Amino acid sequence: PGEHAELAYFKANGFEIEKRAQVLGTLTRAHKGLCVAGTHGKTTTSSMAAHILHQSHVDCNAFLGGITKNYGTNYILSPKSDYVVIEADEFDRSFHWLTPYASVITATDPDHLDIYGTKEAYLESFRKYTSLIRPGGFLVLHEGLEMQPDVQEGVTTYSYSRGHGDFHAENIRIGDGEIYFDLISPLGHIKDVQLGVPVSINIENGIAAMALAQISGVTPEEIKRGMASFRGVDRRFDFRLKDDKAVFLTDYAHHPAEIRQSVISIRELYRGKKIAAIFQPHLYTRTRDFYKEFAESLSLLDEVILTDIYPARETPI
């Protein structure tokens, strides 16, 4: 807030003040930015990519949107690596400050309509973001996005999804609490990839993270080791209790599409089990704009407890 004592001090004493997004933009101009944008999946995918790179010979810096369980922090610093992994946030058009070397776009389901107003404006913002990727860089798009990219000359564009695209999975094996699959990639196939956090939604997240790792020169064995040793992110499909009687997890699924994917992943993992959820809507405007979609997604559950809306930055409407 503008009246914050420390902020007021720096303003009064003539210090240059920049938003976090501006600082991240400076980092992407000084280093090779590996950025993950999209309505959902950003935090897990960028955290996966950061872990794969950090434990490899390539290494990386990283500025993430959640606390990674491998490191207990949302940032990683490396004095030797020229790569920086960044979670590219579309809220307030923050990702327009970035100049990525390579970027994944996970999804473009409309969100933040309090900022954008319309679905068309939201998609146009992502289109502009793709134009910021530097020449000679890379764009990895999820299959089936409505948004059409506008990349500069010399940018290589790939597609990905669980079962289709330039990067995809084959020979998926789910059982006994583990998930294995083969990565099919234009940069070299990798067999028997193991998910460190074995939920099916992480197959796609992992494919995107491995694409960035391959683009950055991480070896196949380093990629497999990083995927298997990734421990997840706080509040992203985060198991808090798991025994013979019950499983309890917390997940920051605050968009209807995210809720749907989370429920599908849980049902695939625990077939035939009852699923009950406590759901706290996030933001008045998001709840207003997508109440029908929320109702449809929550209907996939067996039992739902609704709490009051969490306002975050908003006042009641």
Language model features: what each stretch is:
Residues V84, F167, H189-V193:
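Short beta-strand segments
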Residues E18-G25, F63-G65, E143, G154-G175, ...:
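Beta-strand->loop->alpha-helix junctions that form or flank phosphate-binding loops
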Residues P1-E143, M147-T156, I207, A213-S216, ...:
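Phosphate-binding loop of NTP-binding sites
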Residues A312-I317:
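Glycine- and acidic-residue-enriched helix-capping/strand-helix junction motifs
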Residues V36-S46, I172-L183, V193:
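A polyampholytic, Gly/Pro-enriched intrinsically disordered region
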Residues F138-E143, A276-F279, L300-P311:
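Short internal beta-strands
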Residues G175-G177, P186-E303:
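Nucleotide phosphate-binding/pyrophosphate-handling subdomain across enzymes
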